Amino acid sequence: PLNTQQVTVGGVTYTAWDVSSVTNMGGMFAYARSFNQNLNSWDVSNVTDMTAMFDFTDVFNGNITSWDVSNVTSMLSMFYYALKFNQDIGDWDTSSVTNMLNMFGFTDDFNQDLSTWNTSNVTSMKRMFENAGSFNQPINTQQVTVGGVTYTAWDTSNVTDMSSMFNGSTNPTPFNQVIDKWNTSNVTKMPQLFAFTSAF
């Protein structure tokens, strides 16, 4: 287990797995095909880069629901090919994220409510749910209030690339939600946005 905890070794007491000063966790568990631990106790509040953090983790479905990701700017490929991941991360503060490219690409099981995510700074949603074989949750633009703060969830006004966002070329995606309020005025790339979706 990699839980943050107080330990005493050789008469010295310290906090094991204190990651509170870490800023970059890019690729930390990439290709760790058997890794499946609970990491919910980790203080990741200073992390800015989670690129490919759980990339190609075949069985990972550890609890990370309480993570403070408010400073993270890159979630590029964070769960790419994380085949079994399906934790409730709907309460994550994603307001600083600019890159969600491939974030849930090729996730077989992921199907959680992300309806209150703040995507106002995201510029790339390219392949975000490509071949995500289970995802079918409401992600329309709407006013929400979370923790006393009111904001626009799924604000896509800064997104420039939505290429293959729901493409289901090898694993037809079931996504079939209303997204009629999305602001696509700055999007310059939309090729294969809904290609091979099984229900849309």
What is the role of each PLM region?
Residues 1-200:
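Negatively charged
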